Amino acid sequence: MASTATQRIPVARGRSSEAAGHLRVTASEWFASGARRPYDPIAKTMLETVRGEGPPWPLHVFEKVVATPPVGSGTRWLTMLPGYPDGSYGFAQVDRHLGPAPGPRLYVEYLGQGDSDKPKDYRYSSVERADLIQAQWRAHGVRRTMVVAFDYSSLALLELLRRQQERDAAGEEPGATIDAAFIVNGGLFADSHSHPWDTTPMLKTPVGRVGMWFGQHVPGVLEATLRAAKLFSPSYEVSAAELADLGEAILRRNGAAFMHRAAGFVDEHRRNADRWDLAAIVRELGDTVAVHIAGSEEDPFEPRQITAARERLGPLGVDIQWFPGGHLTTSEHPGLLADAIRGLARAHGVGQPISHPSPTTGETTR
């Protein structure tokens, strides 16, 4: 059982990331390395081909798979769930540090983000994001997986863990099973959110809606918004190229409006406080799921979450870590985050065969 003390991850002096240098993965390179696939959010399933039902369904979602085919049905996967507002591109520098292993790994892109479609009249929520994740697991024949959840993806993960607990309790077929979870800079407890008022809380207001219209249509507005958004630590000298790529990932397919439309995720967490009680989920799942938590020392969005985690999860043996820097560990310290992911993936058997694999109806992953 892990110590209740929080482990601090050391960092070398100077900028830990080559994000401003020539090794940085650009947004266009990232999206070119994945694919858009048709998805039916009503049936909650990935489609082999577009069936031609007409608008607005089906929609298309971006995904990126890192794997050496063929991937056997008895292989444990690594699933990467993105943050808000940068989506899967937020993992681009981490992915570069990871290289081909651990794998197979699946990067999910939610509707509204990155190169996925951005439907206007759509009820964005953590629940529908969980539906998409499960649909992608079925499509790829994923039976067991470790999950890395960054930022607001913690809420989709909490919904997935609760569904898993409910299936286990009812004795139902498990489908894809989460063996381990690593939550980084995410919301853990509904009563511990502390976002600065001029960030996510402002974005969900009419002022935020208007601001994102200007962000989409007026050059330079979104980059200025991101620079002022407290995403980085004061000591991190974010480059113009980094901001431009973050902006490109967010603006893609008219995506700035998603920052307003999806900004109510804290309210959603509070409405589902009992269902998404992480301490209760950890107790009820017991030793069937290993849970690891990490925060950042200079994160202004969720500083109270790690304090609450030490009090509520530490006694349950949950591993808790501190990264240096600000909220976007993915940008400031991608190498440190990649090292942590690699170590946990190794410990939890990512890429290794599962004992007694059963036949799967999922497709063979490319």
Mark where each language-model region is.
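Catalytic active-site module of serine/aspartate enzymes centered on a nucleophile-bearing elbow/loop
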Residues: 314-366
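Flexible "cap/lid" subdomain of the alpha/beta-hydrolase fold that forms the substrate-access gate
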Residues: 5-50, 61-77, 85, 89-90, ...
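Residue-level recognition of oxygen-bearing side chains
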Residues: 86, 93, 336
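Glycine-centered tight beta-turn/hairpin loop motif at sheet-sheet or coil-to-beta transitions
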Residues: 53-58
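A short, Lys/Arg-enriched amphipathic alpha-helix followed by its capping loop at the start of a domain
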Residues: 93-103
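N-terminal mitochondrial targeting presequences
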Residues: 1-2
